[in-house]
């Protein structure tokens, strides 16, 4: 399956994860197995942003569009960070863990989407999960990905508009 992931890009053109293991270099064209992030004493995962919910695996989207991630203006995300890019990724999708993950979100008769996840990497597969109520479209968490290529801003706009009916986030310049 093809999905999209946003990365930081350094001055040498190397890709890096946005938050967890943010200093690691991500190669293009090689299958990568997710690692569990370092846990805090409260059970969260350490990240560049500070502690985050523990949902181990590669986080990707069906669309190269993340209106919940970026540069804020007047309290709302308006732009992509200038040092980020979208990449087309192949997701290893032999096993779909979505039903198992969603079962974790059921408490009695109520469904809590923030709990509809796994506390382990989805070995040999993936599951659909929306990490943020402000996120767009369907997101997934996977064990393995291969970065096929970095997309140009023009390619991101083309995919967003023709496949999802939204314009790509503008990039913050300057």
Residue ranges, per PLM feature:
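Extended catalytic/binding region for NAD+/ADP-ribose chemistry, centered on the ART fold
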Residues: 47-72
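Active-site and NAD+-binding cores of ADP-ribose-processing enzymes
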Residues: 1-45, 74-174
């Amino acid at each position: 399956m093809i999905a999209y992931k946003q990365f930081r890009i350094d001055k040498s053109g190397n890709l890096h994860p946005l938050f967890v293991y943010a200093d690691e270099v991500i190669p293009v064209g090689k299958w990568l197995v997710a690692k569990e992030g370092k846990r805090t004493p409260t059970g969260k995962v350490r990240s560049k942003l500070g502690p985050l919910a523990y949902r181990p695996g590669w986080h990707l989207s069906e669309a190269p569009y993340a209106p919940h991630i970026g540069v804020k203006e007047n309290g709302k995300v308006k732009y992509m960070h200038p040092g980020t890019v979208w990449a087309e990724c192949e997701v290893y999708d032999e096993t779909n863990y979505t039903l198992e993950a969603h079962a974790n979100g059921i408490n009695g008769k109520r469904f809590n989407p923030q709990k509809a996840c796994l506390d382990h990497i989805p070995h040999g597969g993936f599951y659909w999960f929306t990490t943020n109520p402000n996120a767009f479209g369907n997101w997934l968490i996977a064990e393995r990905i291969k970065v096929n290529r970095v997309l140009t801003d023009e390619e991101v706009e083309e995919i967003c508009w023709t496949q999802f009916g939204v314009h790509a986030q503008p990039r913050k310049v300057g």
